[in-house]
């Protein structure tokens, strides 16, 4: 525990102080620039937000040395970062969102990477605030309230000035064995395909995304995340401790124009993709890789390292000048104030780590798929399924 604290606190000081600087710059631009030009604000925010998010990329790439292996055909790999895309992924690990950031950074669109997330995420210190300024979409997990919020948020992206990725985890929650068991029981009772490696997708958000963005988003990137049997599952705590993991990502590109128009057919298309994803994960379990798929080299750029070194130098210089000016440690009051500040940073880091844990995630309140046989009735309500998955 002491070792973990010794590692987490210095990283936390760097991340949260630099993050507050970034949040302040974002707030100033939001107030002064956005009212005059939304596109100019977005371009500035893209650069500003990336200077913060690259710190987390550095933790994955350089501090923990997590190896992300990407499997995709050349055409798909070469398209990434050159077009707007809806990214649909299974929610396998605690750091799936960071894996997405790594791939976005390699594709040159980290600053315009977006996601649909639960509303509580925007209140996370520094990271959640930066996401809010960057136009992430936050939902309450209540479709009666979220439908209009999602629709308006999606339509606002129509004039986004740079290629963006919008990530959507349609399972609605992170994968655990307990949630899988609940999903299997529900599927069996509803005469749906019984999943083995994924949860049952909640399709309303996906249908809304396709319906509202098909006119300006040309592609859907179907990503499948898997953890090899020889690697421990990656977590935020392992990252901060500098402990490596391996993550496999399979990417398949679908053209948005090839999707059907009716909403029920869009929903069925999504369910079919997760049935195929389940079968693909079966193959991965058997071979401990995605067999027959080409592995692409995504490298490890030094940009994130350069950003972290720059932040560390600036903050160290600033801290030295501040301490020299304030004589903070010359009194018990100053020492107590410093200890209080460290305590706040440690608490914020714990909040960030705990918020990422799959065991603490909750299922989305979105109606499940209907069985293909419309004469069969499913469980009495979605609440019943959610209670089983908790």
From Swiss-Prot:
Enzyme Commission number(s): 2.3.1.51
The organism's place on the tree of life at top rank: Eukaryota
Main localization, broad class: endoplasmic reticulum
GO biological process: CDP-diacylglycerol biosynthetic process
Pfam families: Acyltransf_C (PF16076), Acyltransferase (PF01553)
MF GO annotations: 1-acylglycerol-3-phosphate O-acyltransferase activity
Record key words, sorted: Acyltransferase, Endoplasmic reticulum, Lipid biosynthesis, Lipid metabolism, Membrane, Phospholipid biosynthesis, Phospholipid metabolism, Transferase, Transmembrane, Transmembrane helix
Location of the region described as Disordered in the Swiss-Prot/TrEMBL record: 358-390
Membrane-spanning residues: 2-22, 305-325, 333-353
GO CC terms: endoplasmic reticulum membrane
Family assignment from sequence similarity: Belongs to the 1-acyl-sn-glycerol-3-phosphate acyltransferase family.
Protein task: Converts lysophosphatidic acid (LPA) into phosphatidic acid by incorporating acyl moiety at the 2 position.
This protein's domain notes: The HXXXXD motif is essential for acyltransferase activity and may constitute the binding site for the phosphate moiety of the glycerol-3-phosphate.
Name of the protein: 1-acyl-sn-glycerol-3-phosphate acyltransferase 2
Gene responsible for this protein: LPAT2
């Amino acid at each position: 525990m002491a070792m973990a604290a010794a590692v987490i606190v210095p990283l936390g000081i760097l991340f949260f102080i630099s993050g507050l600087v970034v949040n302040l710059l974002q707030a100033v631009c939001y107030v002064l620039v956005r009212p005059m030009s939304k596109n100019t604000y977005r371009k500035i925010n893209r650069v500003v937000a990336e200077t913060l998010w690259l710190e987390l990329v550095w933790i994955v790439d350089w501090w923990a040395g997590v190896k992300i292996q990407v499997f995709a055909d050349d055409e798909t790999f070469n398209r990434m970062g050159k077009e707007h895309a809806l990214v649909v992924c299974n929610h396998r690990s605690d750091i799936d969102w960071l894996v997405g950031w790594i791939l976005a950074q390699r594709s040159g669109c980290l600053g315009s990477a977006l996601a649909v997330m639960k509303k509580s995420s925007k209140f996370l210190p520094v990271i959640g605030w930066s996401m809010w300024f960057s136009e992430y979409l936050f939902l309450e997990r209540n479709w009666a309230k979220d439908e209009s919020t999602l629709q308006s948020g999606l339509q606002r992206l129509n004039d986004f000035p740079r290629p963006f990725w919008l990530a959507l985890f349609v399972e609605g929650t992170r994968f655990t064995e307990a949630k899988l068991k609940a999903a299997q029981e529900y599927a069996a009772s509803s005469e749906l395909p019984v999943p083995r490696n994924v949860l049952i997708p909640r399709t309303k958000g996906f249908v809304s995304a396709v319906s509202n963005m098909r006119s300006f988003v040309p592609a859907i990137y179907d990503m499948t995340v898997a953890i090899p049997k020889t690697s421990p599952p990656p977590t935020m705590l392992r990252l901060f401790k500098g402990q490596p993991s391996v993550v496999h990502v399979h990417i398949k590109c679908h053209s948005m124009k090839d999707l059907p128009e009716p909403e029920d057919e869009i929903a069925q298309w999504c369910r079919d993709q997760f049935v195929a994803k389940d079968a693909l994960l079966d193959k991965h379990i058997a071979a401990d890789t995605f067999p027959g798929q080409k592995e692409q080299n995504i490298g490890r750029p030094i940009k994130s390292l350069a950003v972290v070194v720059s932040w560390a130098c600036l903050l160290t210089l600033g801290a030295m000048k501040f301490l020299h000016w304030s004589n903070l440690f010359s009194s018990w009051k100053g020492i107590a104030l410093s200890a209080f500040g460290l305590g706040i940073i440690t608490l914020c880091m714990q909040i960030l780590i705990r918020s990422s844990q799959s065991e603490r995630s909750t299922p989305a309140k979105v109606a499940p798929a209907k069985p293909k046989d419309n004469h069969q009735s499913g469980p009495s309500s979605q609440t019943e399924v959610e209670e089983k998955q908790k």
